[in-house]
Amino acid sequence: MSILFISGTGTDVGKTIATAALASAFHHRGDRVIPVKPVQTGEPDGRGDIHTVEKLSGIRGVEFTRYPDPLAPNLAARRAGLPQVTLPDLAREIRDLDAPDRIVLVEGAGGVLVRLADDLTLLDVAAELDAPLVLVTSLGLGSLNAAELSVQAARTAGVEVLGLIGGSASPDPGLAEQLNHGELTRICRVPLLGVLPAGAGDLLPDDFQAMAQSCLTLPL
């Protein structure tokens, strides 16, 4: 049915929590959803982003490749002496999960230009699959520049950006965070699909899923 990529303006902006929230909201709408993490780095077995998504959303996910060190995937593969991922393999594995009645949510590693392999980024994979992107961004100082650069990079690569999700929003936002909501949509020329509260990842699954339904506008 649809393949949707989720990336961020950087590390620790709330990308995994946003992926779990999207999975929950799509599932609540009645869609079949499968979250995918093509490359995981720096987590022991039994832990990692896809496990967080599964715990919060209650939806089983898939992880393709894992490297031991907490580095960009190409560096982690090189340091471990393991093969780097390739565009043909990633595209095939993601296509194999796609089905007419299913939404495949593909969570990247770090930002849009983080190298999955020496000459491969998440944007390359999205472009190969002709799949759109949702960008997760911080909301405080520095967010505007990072978000606009990320959206520009996606568009240059031929990847459509369907919208932004604000991650880890403070319960007591400062002036910059308050004003950046509107400014992000203006400069990036895409809608703000929702804002997820700080600490959302600590919620119990039922509470998390209710939060996701109330906080997000689905992009598809």
Curated annotation (Swiss-Prot):
Keyword field contains Ligase: yes
The record lists the catalysed reaction(s) as: (7R,8S)-7,8-diammoniononanoate + CO2 + ATP = (4R,5S)-dethiobiotin + ADP + phosphate + 3 H(+)
Sequence positions that bind ATP: 12-17, 49, 107-110, 167-168, 197-199
Q: Which SUPFAM superfamilies match?
A: P-loop containing nucleoside triphosphate hydrolases
- Record keywords: ATP-binding, Biotin biosynthesis, Cytoplasm, Ligase, Magnesium, Metal-binding, Nucleotide-binding
Check the record and name the Pfam families matching this protein.
AAA_26
Active-site residues? K37
Enzyme class, first EC level, given as a word: ligase
The Gene Ontology biological process annotation of the record reads: biotin biosynthetic process
Q: Where in the cell is it found?
A: Cytoplasm
Where Mg(2+) is bound, by residue?
T16, D49, E107
E.C. no? 6.3.3.3
The record's principal subcellular location, in a coarse class, is cytoplasm
User: Pathway, per UniProt?
Assistant: Cofactor biosynthesis; biotin biosynthesis; biotin from 7,8-diaminononanoate: step 1/2
> Where does this protein hold substrate?
T41
Function of this protein?
Answer: Catalyzes a mechanistically unusual reaction, the ATP-dependent insertion of CO2 between the N7 and N8 nitrogen atoms of 7,8-diaminopelargonic acid (DAPA, also called 7,8-diammoniononanoate) to form a ureido ring.
Query: Which PANTHER family does its entry note?
Result: DETHIOBIOTIN SYNTHETASE (PTHR43210:SF5)
Q: How does it assemble?
A: Homodimer.
Family membership = Belongs to the dethiobiotin synthetase family.
The identity of this protein, by name, is ATP-dependent dethiobiotin synthetase BioD
